[in-house]
Amino acid sequence: MRNVLYPKLAATNIKKNGKTYFPYLLTCILTVMMFYDLLLVSTNSALDTMPGASQLRLILNFAVTITGGFSAIFLFYTNSFLVRQRKKEMGLYQVLGMDKTNLTKMMVWESIYTAGAGILGGILAGIVFGRLIFLVLLKLIRFDVAFQFSVEPEAILISAGLFGAIFLVILIWNIFQVQRVNPVELLQGGKKGEKEPKANWLIAVIGILLLGSGYYIAQTTESPLSAITKFFIAVILVIFGTYALFTAGSVALLKLLKKNKAYYYKTKHFVSVSGLIYRMKQNAVGLANICIMSNIVLVLISATASLYIGQENIMNTRFKTEFSATSDETTPENIQAMERIVQEETQSRGLEIIHEQKYRYVPLSAMKYDNQLKFDTDSGSGYDADAMRGLYVIPLADYNALEGTDISLAPDEVLTYFPDEEFDSGEIVLGKETYHVKENLKESNLQKKKEADVTKNIYLVMADDAAVEHVIQLYGPTKIPITMQYLLNFDMKGNDTAKSEALESMKARMETSGEVQSCYVEYREAYAQEFYGVYSGFFFLGIFVGFLFLMATVLIIYYKQISEGYDDKDRYQIMQKVGMSKKEVKGSIHSQILTVFFVPLLMAILHVTVAFKPITKLLLVFNLSDTHLSMMCTIGVSAVFAVFYVIVFAITSREYYKIVK
């Protein structure tokens, strides 16, 4: 009889607490399903047949890790709401005669039901939707592949093992919570409030300083290279600043509202403000969590959507021309062989070469400070990402041939071209030597003005080959010897099929036939499918992980409203008994929700607005230079999220009102 009691009691408890348990169970099922399907897709052998398979698999494996890690944190966090709501119930069981051993047995069965439903339901849902999810990925990549769908025992075992361990840790924690308190504390657990916190202005000021510092770093980041590190520093500062402002700043704000008699002594404001002050320490952390998670959803989805939608822009940024060949063998014979192959392959197919660039150059890097270019090989020259420039040194003869000019230079004279910034000095210091600037070029076929690139570029035209070699000596020794290279870029006009054939043939002849020495060829068409795979994988990752964080945000809002409702139930009933009408009670509820629950949304949108500049710099690392597209994606995602947030608010506030009335 006793063996049947605990399973029945556990099932009854779950059913009775359906308002809090069923959303949790649904979340468990969806979380397990997402993890299982990501694992299934990432280990599917069909991925190996796709272009960019290694990068795509790396992205998917990263998504699996993120999903697994966040699932543990998320389920543990949401479980705390369930425990808090059930403390009074647990205390009542002890008063009625159940000891802590009996409670433990009941909780074990509740965990078995919860874990069983979550894991089994999630894996079954994953099996049902797994094929659909893989087909969505293929659709995003624009690639057809034979996909053999099968139930993978290994994926099932890994999913069941991971989430089984998560639920076991949650059970142990729940048992510890019940074992360490007495029945009286449990009976008060559901109602237990906190002492009215004082307005901690020090923490509030620290929060403002942290937030301001994060915002300042975000707005002063100029280089995409520095954005990689600075953005994450800014994110950490903003996260800590957000928590500090919500925990201390919110209390300070409510205290100011309380001092504002015109606002505070209105019926609908009086109850909500005083109640929120009383429990703000606990509320503030939950609201900060909602803000941070909302921010993650907005940034993740808008950034990956920008990459996916802007793939054409990415291709144009990465590949300035249809064909590009580079060789570090710059003998006249080798250069002539490259040009001969191009001529033969294009003329035989009736293609016309346009936008041609061909010249020798030395690729270097330097840090620019005013009119000084410091090499990173110089002793004492630390790495400065904001000052870093791509430096291309070109012999005058090649420049004259490219531009059709007849300029002459003395050994200590140079032509300078700064396509990405202004430069008007008459001298330029290169390493330890000073050169006179004969002309600062305003336009050049070397590169278009303000052309998007990860680093800003500088072009220096030197008097002759000897002057170029001298610059290499100034640069100093490197692990890989620096040599002059020959660049051959061009577009073609003609039939698309003929273009494809010519591109493929030129690549094969220059790289593998032996006609040309030490040559590397790349062309847009060859890498298009690989790029689609990588950036579609990012979008797939953004949707999946973004949905996971969105689900967490919704559940936290829901539980926050439910727990607030139970906390306020007695208080509002007392208010109705002393004369407040239902309309006044509802007005007070809306005052509380509008004052507090929309603050996380507004703060998240503010964070995204400030973060937009460094995000566009980071996207440039991925070759996306279309800022307008990024802005439209961010605005669109923010608008959709705001509408979704309002819908969640409407549903949860209705549940809140049902509880308190």
Give the location of each predicted region.
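Basic-flanked hydrophobic alpha-helices used for secretion and membrane insertion
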Residues: 314-327, 333-551
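Hydrophobic alpha-helical transmembrane segments of multi-pass inner-membrane transport and secretion
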Residues: 18-46, 55-88, 111-125, 239, ...
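Hydrophobic alpha-helical segments
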Residues: 113-257
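N-terminal Sec/SRP start-transfer signal
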Residues: 1-32, 196-201, 210, 246-294, ...
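Short helix-loop junctions at transmembrane helix boundaries
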Residues: 40-54, 123-156, 212-229, 600-661
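Hydrophobic alpha-helical transmembrane segments
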Residues: 21-25, 61, 156-161, 201-205, ...
